[in-house]
């Protein structure tokens, strides 16, 4: 996500200072360290995307997940106050909505939060901290609840990239099995390049203190994503159910309503799912060839 956001901001003519743990050694859990880095950057706007993103892994690492996503967000918000940032975009996750009933779909921002995983609970805390920073301190925070995003460069810890990685590996090595976990969940998937457009528009036009869903407004089954990728494979392959890839608890359906975002910014998703998946598969073919 960060690579795509930086590229989009630079394409729009913005001056970008990127703080990334693996590059700069800045840890958002270390309050003095993140404050020093943010203050030194003298930002007018801050995009906070950092944190733990492994939903399934959060069951085994709940403490680490909460520290990264809740304490990390608090530290970033405090650093932004210290730096005098004019706008902060705090990105959480649609997982905060948890289990919803059919009559609650598509999910609006008014939907009650029912976190299921430790990851989701940590994002609820981050969302609340961002709201408190606005209400309590007047920090101009715009909150985002991002549904599933997908695009080139994404980690194979996520479903679609992991499927694409295995297909590309099979094409190279001669295998024909593609392991997969639960195929029934319905997800709302948006191309990451559309998502970063939404983020910049929200920094420009979003209302401080408000929260916005970033989503496509359409649901797609994991099985459908897998079938689309298999259709793009260079030769026949088959899905194989792998219990090790099953999450402890899986939310059956997440599909959002981006009406508020569209009304405020004029944003709409533009890149179709089949194009996104083709780009993801091409990315993995390139990675494995290199």
What are these regions (language model features)?
Residues 31-68:
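NAD(P)H-binding glycine-rich loop region in Rossmannoid oxidoreductase-like domains
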Residues 2-3:
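N-terminal Rossmann-fold NAD(P) dinucleotide-binding loop
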